[in-house]
Amino acid sequence: GSGDILLLQNEISNVSFAMEEARRRGMQIAFNASPITRELMEYPLELVDYFIINEVEGRALAGVASEEYDRILEGLAEQFPNAAIVLTVGEKGVLYYNHGKRLSHGIYAVKAVDSTAAGDTFCGYFLAGLTKGLPMEDILKYASMASAIAVSRQGASTSIPTWEEVIHFEE
């Protein structure tokens, strides 16, 4: 209901229905546009509050061929003026854009063992930060830390760190 956030990925059927129903219930919608499909552009994407996407997905959604991050962000902001854009850019970290506010956060250097859960961990910690009401700078930091910890471990769900591990990561 109201105050909740629904995270959708493009891996289920009825994404459009889920978006419309979430909005009807007053929920915020976070959308990870993976995998990119032709049908995706038929979804009611104007309902999305947060796009959490990588650069390939960003280019496709923005309709730009450019690999320049600024062009991707500008294209997404034009297409989806009411949404915050969270663009993950691999080893360069993450870029955030919302109504003219731009932020970025680098990655944390770790020995990568298994990247299986990196994106899911980032999404989970990003949304956890939102629900905790943290400042966006801290949300990006903690989501990046959590993702770094996850790639330093073997496995998928077993690699996801606890909140305690994340907040003590730099110490």
Model-derived regions: residue spans:
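Ribokinase/PfkB-type carbohydrate-kinase core domain
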Residues: 1-103
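Conserved phosphate-binding/catalytic region of the ribokinase-like
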Residues: 38, 69-171
